[in-house]
Amino acid sequence: MIVVSEIADLKTIISEWKQNQETIGFCPTMGTLHDGHMDLVKTSKGQCTKTIVSIFINPTQFNDPKDFDAYPKNTESDLKLCEEHGVDLVFLPSVEVIYPKSQTPIQMSIPSLQTTLCGRTRPGHFEGVLQIVSKLFHLTEPNYGFFGLKDYQQYRIISAMVEELNFPIKILGVPTKRESDGLAMSSRNLRLSPKDRETASLIPRMFQLAKKTLLGGEKNLIVWKEILTDFLLTGSNVKIDYLEIVDPITLQPLSNLNGELLLATAVFVGEVRLIDNEVLVSP
């Protein structure tokens, strides 16, 4: 496995791979890797001849400096995990390499996809995501980009950017990897106290309740949302950032329970913000 931190070294390797007609898969991460990230790697290795993982905690997508400072860093174990799973190259740049002071900052946005869900409560977050992902796409020149569907809004926004700006990249969403109790895998789970970790299991149980009530014939969106909200709030130390029912493509709020829908939530359990979602079908 190759580990590089400089753009020039990365470009040299990419150039060689392109000359050899390798198919390149790219998995951008912020480190503290877990089995969910490794599912991205496995999917890439099944699709591509070379797999790149980037590890970069991007400061421009944090609207809360405390959140950035608290973000866990485990570079040594991350590299070991990548090597064990057959990653070909890890790009491990510094902030100075990605955002040199000589550059003029550019801001990107897709307003129609950023006004709901996390975009409503985290101003500037997706501008930062689009900025770093577009940079990394240009640097790694992949044929495929792999993104976890736990961050569904991010997946949709990046897919739209690639389509709108004609990036020669195919974006693939990888299903959410879950813990044994159904909680979506996330580096943030490490910050939960034992009691809060138990409380967090309300989130996957809420999705089970959502399916059960839909199959039971619930058709009133307002009533359905109230049922799910009340269930989440049975947990101590829980604060709901949002619980929304939106169109899976446009991410705009729905007014009724007909056909395919995206149920998405962000919940604070203690000080830790957890997100999850599921695409459901109302019969």
Swiss-Prot record:
Record GO terms (molecular function): ATP binding; pantoate-beta-alanine ligase activity
EC top class named in words: ligase
Pfam family of the protein (one): Pantoate_ligase
Residues the entry annotates as binding ATP: 30-37, 148-151, 185-188
Keywords: ATP-binding, Cytoplasm, Ligase, Nucleotide-binding, Pantothenate biosynthesis
Primary localisation category: cytoplasm
This protein's pathway: Cofactor biosynthesis; (R)-pantothenate biosynthesis; (R)-pantothenate from (R)-pantoate and beta-alanine: step 1/1
One GO cellular component, as annotated: cytosol
Compartments where found: Cytoplasm
Listed GO biological process terms: pantothenate biosynthetic process
Residues the record lists as binding beta-alanine: 61
UniProt catalytic activity: (R)-pantoate + beta-alanine + ATP = (R)-pantothenate + AMP + diphosphate + H(+)
Residues at which (R)-pantoate binds: 61, 154
Assembly and interaction partners: Homodimer.
Family assignment from sequence similarity: Belongs to the pantothenate synthetase family.
UniProt-recorded name of the protein: Pantothenate synthetase
Organism field: Leptospira biflexa serovar Patoc (strain Patoc 1 / ATCC 23582 / Paris)
Name of the coding gene: panC
